[in-house]
Amino acid sequence: MKHSKKTYDSFQDELEDYIKVQKARGLEPKTCFRKMREDYLETYGYKEEVDSRPRCRMFEQRLPYGTVQTYPRSCSISQRVEKQLPQWLPAHDSRLRLDSLSYSQFTRDCFSGKPVPPNLSQHESNCSSYSVESGVYRHLSSENNTSAHQASYKHIHQKRKRHTEEGREKPEEERPKHKRKKACEEIDLDKYKSIQTSKTEAETVRVSTEKLKNRKEKRSRDVASKKEERKRRKEKKEQGQERTEEEMLWDQSILGF
């Protein structure tokens, strides 16, 4: 037989029924939720308050002496905000943001009706002094940022200018070297040309001398051959004349001419 599901009018009735069932089974249910929550708050809330007190000292140093009142709520808010900030941010920027957030919470507490201080004029003077101090601090930080930006820009500009000047000076320094190199190349070219011309002149002189020598030798050979030819002709002529005389004598003796 299936049990029908009970319906309860309130959570309290359901809780009482649950306790009865657990006790019938011999169990002791834990129903002190409020007590556990209070114990948790006492343990962890106290730690949070203790951890937040050193951060409240920073605000006490900024405010004038005798007018400082700590606010654990603002410090706990700053602590939670610091935990939520990303880890890559610098410590200086995170502190500045925490200071601004904590002081904004402090001003809200000053002007809100929740923590009504006994001396309202004193808190107003504290809030006004904080606003003046924060304005001066922001102005100084902005001036520092602008001066650092200007200094970095000036350094970069000077560096570029120096590089450009060095780039301009380098060709001027290299010009004499280039000129000397060009002059040396021209001298070498002239020397090469003079050597080539001297070689060609010597070659032409040699060729001309050889031609003259050959001509002289040819002429001498021609003269010698002509002399030999004349000598032969003369000898032949003389021989011819002698034969004719002999022939004439022979003819006279034999033939009777």
Curated annotation (Swiss-Prot):
- The biased composition feature labelled Basic and acidic residues covers 163-176, 183-193, 200-212, 219-228
- Region annotation Disordered: residue ranges? 145-257
Bias kind Basic residues: ranges:
152-162
**Coiled coil start-end:** 210-248
Print the keywords alphabetically.
Coiled coil
| Residue spans crossing the bilayer | none
Protein's UniProt name: Lysine-rich coiled-coil protein 1
Q: Which gene encodes it?
A: KRCC1
